[in-house]
């Protein structure tokens, strides 16, 4: 059987942190594993949206940079050499007569005995700055992602938004930029209390309650933004080198909603085995829901082994759901 028609034990749809850990764990269970990821690189939102952000709620790490966590997860799964298919968005999943699954992407067709969906919040894109002239500066010095902090070294930066990402980005930029302003339409930020406390103690100029109403530039780059006080008459113009927008992201399940899975809002319903309503399809991470679900990376790390162990039992009912401890596997 060649690679095109090989039937894998477990195919993981979604190469974010939970998918990477699921691949490692499936490797420990001696499963043949394939990861299918729609983005050009592994890591999901951590690599694409927040590679420079620090994460503080991962067990064993007082803090860890998002991309560092992804790199460690990739390194962890490497001994088991899972097959990785990048830039392939899954369009459909069909159960075959023999009980295996046919997984069709825009590029290829894959086959698997079981599937674990770890697609996070599904397809996502940023909410954009809805102002005339803004679009022409996107990709120049209006940004929706921060992939490399060093590019802002010595520059005057304004960050727009009031959530965790906006506040965290502002705090990180303070260390490298010549000046940082944060613009939010409300007086109170929605970010974690600890981050807001750090913001208030920092040198960052806090512009609240203001919204941007105009962007000005020379056609090649943005040079100024005009701010308007919410429910007030005060206006202010900032001279800046970079404008970072964090209004959040719009996500959708995309084709997943057509796969016959039982859904609740934009999440896939699972039972205590992380099993969907379709036998052989499991979920882990933010994509799934159940009573009492908490959406954290740490939660997904716990769900992934449950999904893998039950998937292995589905493939071969003689296989133990409760595995040996990892300390005995690597001796």
From Swiss-Prot:
Reaction catalyzed: 2 reduced [2Fe-2S]-[ferredoxin] + NADP(+) + H(+) = 2 oxidized [2Fe-2S]-[ferredoxin] + NADPH
GO molecular function: ferredoxin-NADP+ reductase activity; flavin adenine dinucleotide binding; NADP binding
Keywords, comma-separated and alphabetical: FAD, Flavoprotein, NADP, Oxidoreductase
E.C. number(s) listed in UniProt: 1.18.1.2
Cofactor binding note: Binds 1 FAD per subunit.
EC category name: oxidoreductase
Residues that coordinate or bind FAD: 37, 45, 50, 90, 124, 286, 327
InterPro entries xref list: FAD/NAD-bd_sf (IPR036188), FAD/NAD-binding_dom (IPR023753), Fd--NADP_Rdtase_type_2 (IPR022890), Ferredoxin-NADP_redctase_2 (IPR050097)
SUPFAM superfamilies for this protein: FAD/NAD(P)-binding domain
Cofactor: FAD
Keyword Nucleotidyltransferase: no
Oligomeric and partner information: Homodimer.
Family: Belongs to the ferredoxin--NADP reductase type 2 family.
HAMAP family, A to Z: FENR2 (MF_01685)
Name of the protein: Ferredoxin--NADP reductase 2
Organism (species): Listeria innocua serovar 6a (strain ATCC BAA-680 / CLIP 11262)
């Amino acid at each position: 059987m060649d690679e095109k028609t090989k039937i894998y034990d477990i195919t993981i749809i979604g190469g974010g942190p939970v998918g990477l850990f699921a691949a490692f764990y499936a490797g420990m269970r001696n499963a043949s594993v394939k990861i299918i990821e729609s983005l050009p690189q592994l890591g999901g939102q951590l690599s694409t949206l927040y590679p420079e952000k620090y994460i503080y709620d991962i067990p064993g790490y007082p803090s860890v940079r998002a991309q560092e966590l992804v790199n460690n997860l990739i390194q962890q799964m490497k001994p088991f050499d899972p097959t990785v298919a990048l830039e392939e968005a899954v369009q459909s999943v069909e159960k075959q007569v023999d009980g295996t699954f046919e997984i069709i992407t825009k590029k290829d067709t894959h086959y698997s005995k079981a599937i674990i969906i770890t697609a996070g919040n599904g397809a996502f894109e940023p909410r954009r700055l809805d102002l005339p002239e803004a679009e022409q500066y996107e990709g120049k010095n209006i940004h929706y992602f921060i992939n490399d902090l060093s590019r802002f070294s010595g520059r005057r930066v304004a960050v727009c938004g009031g959530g965790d990402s906006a506040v965290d980005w502002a705090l990180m930029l303070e260390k490298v930029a010549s000046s940082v302003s944060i613009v939010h339409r409300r007086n109170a930020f929605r970010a974690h209390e600890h981050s807001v406390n750090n913001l208030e103690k920092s040198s960052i100029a806090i512009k609240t309650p203001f919204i941007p109403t105009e962007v000005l530039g020379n056609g090649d780059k943005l040079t100024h933004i005009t701010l308007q006080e919410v429910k007030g008459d005060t206006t202010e113009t900032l001279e800046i080198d970079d404008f970072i927008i964090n209004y959040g992201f719009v996500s959708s399940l995309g084709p997943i909603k057509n796969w016959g899975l039982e859904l609740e809002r934009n999440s896939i319903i699972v039972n205590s085995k992380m099993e969907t309503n379709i036998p052989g399809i499991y979920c882990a991470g933010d994509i799934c829901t159940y009573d009492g679900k908490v959406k954290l990376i740490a939660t997904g790390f716990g769900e992934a082994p449950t999904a893998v162990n039950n998937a292995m039992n589905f493939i071969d009912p003689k296989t133990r759901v409760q595995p040996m401890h990892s300390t005995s596997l690597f001796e």
